[in-house]
């Protein structure tokens, strides 16, 4: 490791390049999975062919389980449905910033960011604004790069997600994620 927190070379699990690449694959897969379940269609989002290694599959499955739990939170679904998407960029960045405003970073909040992005993509699909899908993914990855990258590196890369949610209490954490997202949406609605 050099002094910046990055591993020397570009291939390590905590390198900026690898974290962003894995994050893009996970976000793409998460959004395609959610869209396929909700809209019956899978948007064409392929940036590159996602890796088929066991680690990425485990991470994707972990995200899928959490997404399924969040889908069953009716209060959260109602609040997301009420979000005005006339200015989606402003909505996305305000909610994303509110999620991390207290300076506390954890995997639950990272997953909440992915979940919120997937819900905005589903709204774009429903309103037939497909060009917005790649834009939302870009915003999410920009936010990840600018605000979360160093924290993810400090957690050992994306593998930290598995240890965080790999415990039997992941359902409890899912409730926490829903709470963070609900609180962020509430703050945004009061300010907006």
UniProtKB/Swiss-Prot annotation:
The modification N-acetylmethionine is found at residue 1. There is a cross-link at residues 128, 190 (Glycyl lysine isopeptide (Lys-Gly) (interchain with G-Cter in ubiquitin)). Ubiquitinated in the absence of XRCC6/Ku70. Ubiquitinated on Lys-128 and Lys-190. 'Lys-63'-linked polyubiquitin chains on Lys-128 are removed by USP12. A motif (BH1) lies at residues 98-118. PROSITE patterns: BCL2_FAMILY, BH1, BH2, BH3. The keyword DNA repair does not apply. Expressed in a wide variety of tissues. SMART domains: BCL (SM00337). GO terms for molecular function: BH3 domain binding; channel activity; Hsp70 protein binding; identical protein binding; lipid binding; protein heterodimerization activity; protein homodimerization activity; protein-folding chaperone binding. The chain crosses the membrane at residues 172-192. One of its GO terms (cellular component) is endoplasmic reticulum membrane. Keywords: Acetylation, Apoptosis, Cytoplasm, Host-virus interaction, Isopeptide bond, Membrane, Mitochondrion, Mitochondrion outer membrane, Nucleus, Transmembrane, Transmembrane helix, Ubl conjugation. GO terms for biological process: apoptotic mitochondrial changes; apoptotic process; apoptotic process involved in blood vessel morphogenesis; apoptotic process involved in embryonic digit morphogenesis; apoptotic process involved in mammary gland involution; apoptotic signaling pathway; B cell apoptotic process; B cell homeostasis. A motif (BH3) lies at residues 59-73. A motif (BH2) lies at residues 150-165. Accelerates programmed cell death by binding to, and antagonizing the apoptosis repressor BCL2 or its adenovirus homolog E1B 19k protein. Under stress conditions, undergoes a conformation change that causes translocation to the mitochondrion membrane, leading to the release of cytochrome c that then triggers apoptosis. Promotes activation of CASP3, and thereby apoptosis. BAX deficiency leads to lymphoid hyperplasia and male sterility, because of the cessation of sperm production. Intact BH3 motif is required by BIK, BID, BAK, BAD and BAX for their pro-apoptotic activity and for their interaction with anti-apoptotic members of the Bcl-2 family. Belongs to the Bcl-2 family. Homodimer. Forms higher oligomers under stress conditions. Forms heterooligomers with BAK. Interacts with BCL2L11. Interaction with BCL2L11 promotes BAX oligomerization and association with mitochondrial membranes, with subsequent release of cytochrome c. Forms heterodimers with BCL2. Forms heterodimers with BCL2L1 isoform Bcl-X(L), BCL2L2, MCL1 and A1. Interacts with SH3GLB1. Interacts with SFN and YWHAZ; the interaction occurs in the cytoplasm. Under stress conditions, JNK-mediated phosphorylation of SFN and YWHAZ, releases BAX to mitochondria. (Microbial infection) Interacts with gamma-herpesvirus 68 protein vBCL2. PANTHER family: APOPTOSIS REGULATOR BAX, BCL-2 RELATED. This is Apoptosis regulator BAX.
């Amino acid at each position: 490791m050099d002094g910046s927190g990055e591993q020397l070379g570009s291939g390590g699990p905590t390198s900026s390049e690898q974290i962003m690449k894995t994050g893009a694959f996970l976000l793409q897969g998460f959004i395609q999975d959610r869209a396929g379940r909700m809209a019956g269609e899978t948007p064409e989002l392929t940036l590159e062919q996602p890796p088929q290694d066991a680690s990425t599959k485990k991470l994707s499955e972990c995200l899928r389980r959490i997404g399924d739990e969040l889908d069953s939170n009716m209060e959260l679904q109602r609040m997301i449905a009420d979000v005005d998407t006339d200015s989606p960029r402003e909505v996305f960045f305000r909610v994303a910033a509110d999620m991390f405003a207290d300076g506390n970073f954890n995997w639950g909040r990272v997953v909440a960011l992915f979940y919120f992005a997937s819900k905005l993509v589903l709204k774009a699909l429903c309103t037939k604004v497909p060009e917005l899908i790649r834009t939302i993914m870009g915003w999410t990855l920009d936010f990840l790069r600018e605000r979360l990258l160093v924290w993810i590196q400090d957690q050992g890369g994306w593998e930290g997600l598995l240890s965080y949610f790999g415990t039997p209490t992941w359902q409890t954490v899912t409730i926490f994620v829903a709470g963070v997202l609900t609180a962020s949406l509430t703050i945004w609605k009061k300010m907006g």
